[in-house]
Amino acid sequence: MKLIQSGSVDKVKEALEGDPSLADYRDPQGLSALMWAVYTGQTAVRDLLLKKRADLGIALDVFEAAATGSEAELHSILSKDAATAQAFSGDGWTALHLAAAFGTPLSAGSLIFRGAKVDAVSQNPQRNQPLHAALALGRNSSTMELLLAHGADPNATQVGGFTPIFSAATANRKDLAELLMAHGANPQLTDDQGKTPADFARERGHEELAIWLEVQPA
C-alpha cells in the first residue's frame, strides 16, 4: 500500500510483473489495492491496476466499480444483484458514497435506480451521507443535483454537526452553496462548536464568500 501511495507507476508495474496476484491484494478491512489508489488520488496507479485486473480477468466489486466510474461493470453487478446497491464496504461506505466522492453522475444514477439510499449513513466515524461525500470530495454539481432531486437532505449532519454547505464554504465554492440553498440548505446552522459556514470560509481566507454567507436567510 505504501508503494501505491508513493504514486510511482513504474515501481507498481514492476511489483505486478513480479507477482500479478498483487493486483487483487486486499488489506485486513477488505480494501483492495485499487481502492487505495482511488483514496490516495493516484490516478495513474488506479488506471494501471484497472488494466492489469482486466487483463487477468479479475472482476471489480460494486464499490470499486462505483468509485472508478466503471459503468459497464457497475451495470452488470447491479443487474445480477440489486441488493449490492445498499451494501456497505469494509470501511463503512455504500457504493453511492463512493460514486458521489470519486465516481460519476452516471454511476450515482445507476445506483439510485437500483435502490441505493440517498440518506444512507456511513458505518464509520464520519457518519455522513452521500451528499456530504459529494461536497467533501467529488464536488460535481450534476451528482449533487441528482442526490438532491431524489430526496437527499441538504441540512443533514455528519459527525461534528457539519451540514454539506460547510464543505462548500471550506472549498470556496459559492456555486455549490447556492445549489444547496436552492434545495433548502440553511447557511446559518452551526456545527457542534457553534461555528457557521461563514466562519469556516473566513478561517480559510475566503472573506468574500464569508460575507455573502452571513447575509443569507436561514
Regions found by a protein language model. Give the residues of each.
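Ankyrin-repeat boundary/"N-cap" motif
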Residues: M1, R26-A33, G57-E64, A87-A95, ...
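Conserved ankyrin/ankyrin-like repeat signature
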Residues: K11, A44-V45, E73, L106-S107, ...
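N-terminal segments that cap or nucleate solenoid repeat domains
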Residues: M1-D27, T68-G90, A95
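Eukaryotic tandem repeat interaction scaffolds
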Residues: A100, K117-E145, Q158
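Ankyrin repeat domain, specifically the short helix-to-loop turn at the C-terminus of the second helix
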Residues: E14-S21, D47-D55, L78-T84, G109-K117, ...
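Ankyrin repeat A-helix N-terminal signature
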Residues: K2-S8, W36-Q42, E64-S70, L98-T104, ...
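Ankyrin-repeat-protein effector appendages
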Residues: K2, D47-A67, S76, K80, ...
